[in-house]
Amino acid sequence: MAGVVGERRGIPDISMDASCASAAAVYGNNGSYPAEPPGWSTACGTSLAAPMFAGIVALAAQQAGHTLGAINPALYRMAASHAPGVVDVVHGDNSFTFSSQGKTHIVPGFHAQRGYDLISGLGTIDAAQFVPELAKAAG
């Protein structure tokens, strides 16, 4: 099946801020890494994006007044109808450049384009507009 890596999906639905350059401060209390003392650290990548999106979906469920269930059908309908809150990402790529043994290497990635693409999925979201739209669409 296309898009499946092993037993899991390998393609995006939505993109969120995952850059470690804009990481979020988080307080840990020995939850993930028992050998580390409690304290502040940073979260980025999926460790930031997944809970951020989950929180936004929770706000939509709260606004709807009930659980939303599987939101993918609503998400794809919202994107297809250009609903407020779903923002198409049309520029950028995820190519990666690094140096090793004095040589520069470029690992080509995917490029953003109008509509669905393999770098940002349907795009990103504007939470203030997305929450009420998802509450209606998944209702």
Spell out what each predicted region is:
Residues 1-139:
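Extracellular protease catalytic domains of secreted zymogens
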